Amino acid sequence: MSRYRGPRLKKIRRLGALPGLTRKTPKSGSNLKKKFYSGKKEQYRIRLQEKQKLRFHYGLTERQLLRYVHIAGKAKKSTGQVLLQLLEMRLDNIVFRLGMASTIPGARQLVNHRHILVNGRIVDIPSFRCKPRDIITTKDNQRSKRLVQNSIASFDPGRLPKHLTVDTLQYKGLVQKILDRKWVGLKINELLFVEY
């Protein structure tokens, strides 16, 4: 299954708030959800929705998500917690969480177009796994800085997780440590997803 490129608000109406997918929110007065999706929720449907939230928020394909679940399953800690840590330490997600891009797809495009450096080297793989003490910066050219400038100007420093630090003047961010569960930017029950 390929990456989703369709209407984003349709997914947000169905699954709830997905801050990595888009900044837009559906109209509050819409009662479409009540009209079409009322009734008892089955266990399968609840688990599927949790999986879809995870998939659409981080912009993953089905195969990528299964690969991350397989890696997390081999760990000695809780599978759900390790899975969220793996997804949060992806380069495209860290660029988004640092405020260098307004959405995760926007961050993925910055990385793919070679505007982002990790420890002084160009990295053009969005799924690159960042480690503690990695320094994420933009290229020194004016074009790269201009792309990041608008997002950083509208970024709220209060939303920055505790495992990251950012220097907005130098367009630089630092990964200090591995993420705690409470700082994940998505409201999700990872146990339901792992059961799926």
Curated annotation (Swiss-Prot):
Domain S4 RNA-binding: 89-150
Keywords from the UniProt entry: Chloroplast, Plastid, Ribonucleoprotein, Ribosomal protein, RNA-binding, rRNA-binding
Keyword Chloroplast part of the UniProt annotation: yes
Domain of life: Eukaryota
A GO biological-process term: translation
N-terminal signal peptide: none
Primary site of residence: plastid
Subcellular location: Plastid, Chloroplast
Keyword Chloroplast: yes
GO molecular function: rRNA binding; structural constituent of ribosome
Pfam families: Ribosomal_S4 (PF00163), S4 (PF01479)
InterPro entries, alphabetized: Ribosomal_uS4 (IPR022801), Ribosomal_uS4_bac-type (IPR005709), Ribosomal_uS4_CS (IPR018079), Ribosomal_uS4_N (IPR001912), S4_RNA-bd (IPR002942), S4_RNA-bd_sf (IPR036986)
GO (cellular component) term, any one: small ribosomal subunit
Homology family: Belongs to the universal ribosomal protein uS4 family.
Oligomeric and partner information: Part of the 30S ribosomal subunit. Contacts protein S5. The interaction surface between S4 and S5 is involved in control of translational fidelity.
UniProt function note: One of the primary rRNA binding proteins, it binds directly to 16S rRNA where it nucleates assembly of the body of the 30S subunit. With S5 and S12 plays an important role in translational accuracy.
The protein, known as: Small ribosomal subunit protein uS4c
Taxonomic placement: Eukaryota, Viridiplantae, Streptophyta, Embryophyta, Tracheophyta
